[in-house]
């Protein structure tokens, strides 16, 4: 019942339970929202970033990298390491309500991220994105944040490309 309340499954009494399809429009809107909010948080955070916070970010980037290069990556640990890294600047700016809202916004976005992570082999690109964000923070390059965050968060759509409408079309609700 809880899965149905969260939109993950559809239960038809006496017939069965099916996993719900992803809503591509919602995924796109959530990425758009997170891009706008996270870029702003980073612009506010970067000038205030302390040496201790920079060291924490570096450790978290390196922790993600260590998980990503394992022979058989643990995708749940990668997901949590990614959340910890991005949560760093939200926590530093005392914007944890925003972070929590973005993380819990809709199950479709989390499921889409897992589809990307588990099927595209795009971990090297994610590592490069994290390094670029870390370097922009260290340089306090305020103009870099929006394009970097946009590239990073839209990466799944870019990596999956035509597979979204071909190989994984059945994972998504039909376009209306």
Task: Spell out what each predicted region is.
Residues 121-124:
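Active-site loop of classical SDR/Rossmann-like NAD(P)-dependent oxidoreductases
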Residues 25, 51-115, 126-139, 144-158:
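Conserved amphipathic alpha-helical segments that form helical-bundle/coiled-coil interaction surfaces
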């Amino acid at each position: 019942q809880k899965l149905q309340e969260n939109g993950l499954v559809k239960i038809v009494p006496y017939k069965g339970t099916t996993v719900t399809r992803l809503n591509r429009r919602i995924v796109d809107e959530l990425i758009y929202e997170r891009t706008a909010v996270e870029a702003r948080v980073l612009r506010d955070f970067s000038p205030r970033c302390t040496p201790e916070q920079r060291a924490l970010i570096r450790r978290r980037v390196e922790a993600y990298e260590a998980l990503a290069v394992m022979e058989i990556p643990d995708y749940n640990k990668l997901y949590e390491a990614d959340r910890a890294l991005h949560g760093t600047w939200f926590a530093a700016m005392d914007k944890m309500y925003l972070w929590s809202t973005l993380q819990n916004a809709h199950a479709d976005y989390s499921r889409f991220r897992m589809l990307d992570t588990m099927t595209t082999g795009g971990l090297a690109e994610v590592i490069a994105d994290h390094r670029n964000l870390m370097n922009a923070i260290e340089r306090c390059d305020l103009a870099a944040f929006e394009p970097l965050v946009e590239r990073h968060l839209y990466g799944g759509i870019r990596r999956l490309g035509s597979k979204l409408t071909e190989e994984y079309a059945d994972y998504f609700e039909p376009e209306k």
